[in-house]
UniProtKB/Swiss-Prot annotation:
<comment type="function">
    <text>Catalyzes the formation of N(7)-methylguanine at position 46 (m7G46) in tRNA.</text>
</comment>
<keyword id="KW-0489">Methyltransferase</keyword>
<keyword id="KW-0819">tRNA processing</keyword>
<dbReference type="InterPro" id="IPR003358">
    <property type="entry name" value="tRNA_(Gua-N-7)_MeTrfase_Trmb"/>
</dbReference>
<dbReference type="InterPro" id="IPR055361">
    <property type="entry name" value="tRNA_methyltr_TrmB_bact"/>
</dbReference>
<feature type="binding site">
    <location>
        <position position="59"/>
    </location>
    <ligand>
        <name>S-adenosyl-L-methionine</name>
    </ligand>
</feature>
<dbReference type="GO" id="GO:0043527">
    <property type="term" value="C:tRNA methyltransferase complex"/>
</dbReference>
<keyword id="KW-0949">S-adenosyl-L-methionine</keyword>
<comment type="similarity">
    <text>Belongs to the class I-like SAM-binding methyltransferase superfamily. TrmB family.</text>
</comment>
<dbReference type="Pfam" id="PF02390">
    <property type="entry name" value="Methyltransf_4"/>
</dbReference>
<comment type="pathway">
    <text>tRNA modification; N(7)-methylguanine-tRNA biosynthesis.</text>
</comment>
<keyword id="KW-0808">Transferase</keyword>
<dbReference type="InterPro" id="IPR029063">
    <property type="entry name" value="SAM-dependent_MTases_sf"/>
</dbReference>
<dbReference type="GO" id="GO:0008176">
    <property type="term" value="F:tRNA (guanine(46)-N7)-methyltransferase activity"/>
</dbReference>
<feature type="binding site">
    <location>
        <position position="84"/>
    </location>
    <ligand>
        <name>S-adenosyl-L-methionine</name>
    </ligand>
</feature>
<feature type="binding site">
    <location>
        <position position="111"/>
    </location>
    <ligand>
        <name>S-adenosyl-L-methionine</name>
    </ligand>
</feature>
<protein>
    <recommendedName>
        <fullName>tRNA (guanine-N(7)-)-methyltransferase</fullName>
        <ecNumber>2.1.1.33</ecNumber>
    </recommendedName>
</protein>
Length: 226
């Protein structure tokens, strides 16, 4: 998710929050340690991150946290975790969380794929995968998240009826993801625009708002765990 796309938020000019604030909101996990020793890290779950049993939703590539912070404000009985590889946008997300006194949101700086071993079975209510880097060429394969492996891991981690929300601005990449989802019979595919909109929140991510301002067409589908 770190590949630049338009006005990438990693170029933001923002100072780090105070250490005690970072300690509360941010888990900055070393990728090598996470890859080799995942058992030494916290489980990515509501009990581990929030010390409660509230439903958990995760935003993959959360950027400045616009989506998860807004959702957390609107849904105080749901926990939210934003995952991002770039630090500066997370600084902005954390500062907003502090200013608005949002207690049910946390952030992880790492590659989401490394979190698979840390996601307990049936522990997640919803996954947001909005505006990923389009992976249509071999040289971009290092950015690939949406795959058969991803769908298997998310199926394990999602509760029955849990959802994966996918939105993309790439007419080339979107059909690739949709075909993968459609071929996985463990999920129900919802691709009708009106039905998707009815299931989606009004809140938008950084990229969603950015591409709206550019007038760019967007494509979406939802996968529901059977």
């Amino acid at each position: 998710m770190g590949k630049g796309r338009g006005r990438h938020p990693s170029r933001l000019k923002v100072k780090p929050p105070e250490p005690e604030i970072l300690a509360k909101y941010l888990h900055h996990w070393n990728t090598k340690e996470l890859y080799h020793h995942p058992d030494t890290f916290l489980q990515v779950s509501s009990p581990s991150f929030f010390q409660n049993e509230n439903p958990l939703e995760i935003d993959i590539g959360c950027a400045t946290g616009d989506l998860v912070c807004s959702l957390a404000q609107k849904n105080p009985q749901v926990n939210f975790i934003g995952v991002e590889v770039s630090m500066k946008p997370l600084y902005r997300a954390i500062k907003y969380s502090v200013r608005e006194q949002i207690e049910n949101v946390r952030f992880i700086k790492t590659d989401f794929r490394l979190l698979y071993p840390l996601l307990p079975d049936a522990s997640v209510q919803k996954i947001f995968f909005h505006f990923p880097v389009p992976v249509v060429r071999a040289k971009d394969s290092k950015y690939l998240i949406f795959s058969e492996d991803f769908l298997s891991e998310m199926h394990r981690a999602l509760q029955v009826g849990g959802m994966i929300s996918v939105i993309s601005d790439s007419a080339e990449y979107f059909p690739i993801m949709r075909e993968l989802g459609q071929n996985d019979t463990r999920y129900e595919l919802i691709s009708d625009e009106a039905k998707c909109m009815a299931l989606e929140p009004d809140e938008k991510s950084y990229y969603h708002k950015y591409w709206d301002a550019q007038g760019r067409e967007k494509f979406r589908f939802i996968l529901v765990k059977k």
